[in-house]
Curated annotation (Swiss-Prot):
<comment type="similarity">
    <text>Belongs to the MIP/aquaporin (TC 1.A.8) family. SIP (TC 1.A.8.10) subfamily.</text>
</comment>
<feature type="transmembrane region" description="Helical; Name=2">
    <location>
        <begin position="55"/>
        <end position="75"/>
    </location>
</feature>
<feature type="transmembrane region" description="Helical; Name=6">
    <location>
        <begin position="213"/>
        <end position="233"/>
    </location>
</feature>
<dbReference type="InterPro" id="IPR000425">
    <property type="entry name" value="MIP"/>
</dbReference>
<feature type="transmembrane region" description="Helical; Name=4">
    <location>
        <begin position="138"/>
        <end position="158"/>
    </location>
</feature>
<dbReference type="GO" id="GO:0015250">
    <property type="term" value="F:water channel activity"/>
</dbReference>
<keyword id="KW-1133">Transmembrane helix</keyword>
<dbReference type="InterPro" id="IPR023271">
    <property type="entry name" value="Aquaporin-like"/>
</dbReference>
<feature type="transmembrane region" description="Helical; Name=1">
    <location>
        <begin position="14"/>
        <end position="34"/>
    </location>
</feature>
<keyword id="KW-0677">Repeat</keyword>
<keyword id="KW-0472">Membrane</keyword>
<dbReference type="Pfam" id="PF00230">
    <property type="entry name" value="MIP"/>
</dbReference>
<comment type="function">
    <text>Aquaporins facilitate the transport of water and small neutral solutes across cell membranes.</text>
</comment>
<keyword id="KW-0813">Transport</keyword>
<feature type="short sequence motif" description="NPA 2">
    <location>
        <begin position="191"/>
        <end position="193"/>
    </location>
</feature>
<keyword id="KW-0812">Transmembrane</keyword>
<dbReference type="InterPro" id="IPR044222">
    <property type="entry name" value="SIP1-1/2-like"/>
</dbReference>
Length: 245
């Protein structure tokens, strides 16, 4: 990728990540507003989950179109690691060196923006990823959850149904399920940029725990998922035929 194209890709990543953190962080408030409008009782958690999953589906569909329109922009750094390990893409080191910081900066902007824009009655719904256990347990949880969701996303996108609506519903349901599974451990994030944005807001972005739990282990989980997907689900590359003498 030429330098100009790489810079444009990094700028697109920053914009998309900003918008993703801004919108995704508002899902809790949006769910509360919708359930309140529908008159759903506060204890009916399954209805709230249905609303959240539906809203997330709309968000994923919208961002899929947006990322495509911007030439393949991404709002999650682990996408590159998973795609590389799966043999689906091979980004240059220069590209990664520009796009990772751009995504982190976009996430910081998104987290700061939603913190300012969120109405007072919904401020309590703003809860970014936070470590609720010891660092080693949190790192293991974040790595395992990232592995699970990455493998699921790869399968749905590459091998899953061709119907866009069904594909989006599978993705949103999987994401919500994994978030529920990791809620008592790390938040969870499964997106280092998103975690960094909220860590910056809460002033613990420059700690070892943040790097260890929300960057190193998710990358390990994503790369392992990509490698397993490549071995299990993708056909091996054809061997070149040798000419007989």
């Amino acid at each position: 990728m030429a330098m100009g194209a790489t810079v444009r890709a990094a700028a697109a990543d920053a914009v998309v990540t900003f918008l993703w953190v801004l919108c995704a962080s508002a899902l809790g408030a949006s769910t509360a507003a919708v359930t309140s409008y529908l008159g759903v009782q506060e204890g009916a958690g399954h209805y709230a989950l249905l609303v959240t999953t539906s809203l997330l589906s709309v968000l994923l569909f919208t961002f899929d179109l947006l990322c495509g329109a911007l030439g393949g922009a991404s709002f999650n750094p682990t996408d590159f690691a998973a795609s590389y390990a799966a043999g689906l893409d091979s980004p240059s080191l220069f590209s990664v060196a520009l796009r990772f910081p751009a995504q982190a900066a976009g996430a910081v902007g998104g987290a700061l923006a939603i913190s300012e824009l969120m109405p007072a009655q919904y401020k309590h719904t703003l809860a970014g990823p936070s470590l609720k256990v010891d660092p080693h347990t949190g790192a293991l949880a974040e790595g395992v959850l990232t592995f699970v969701i990455t493998l699921t996303v790869l399968w749905v996108i590459v091998k899953g149904p061709r119907n866009v609506i069904l594909k989006t519903l599978l993705l949103s349901t999987s994401i919500v399920s994994v978030i529920l599974a990791g809620a008592e451990y790390t938040g969870p994030s499964m997106n280092p940029a998103n975690a960094f944005g909220w860590a910056y807001v809460n002033n613990w972005h420059n700690t070892w725990e943040q790097l260890y739990v929300y960057w190193i282990c998710p990358f390990i989980g994503a790369m392992l998922a990509g490698w397993i997907f490549r071995v299990v689900f993708l056909p091996p590359a054809p061997k070149p035929k040798t000419k007989k003498a």
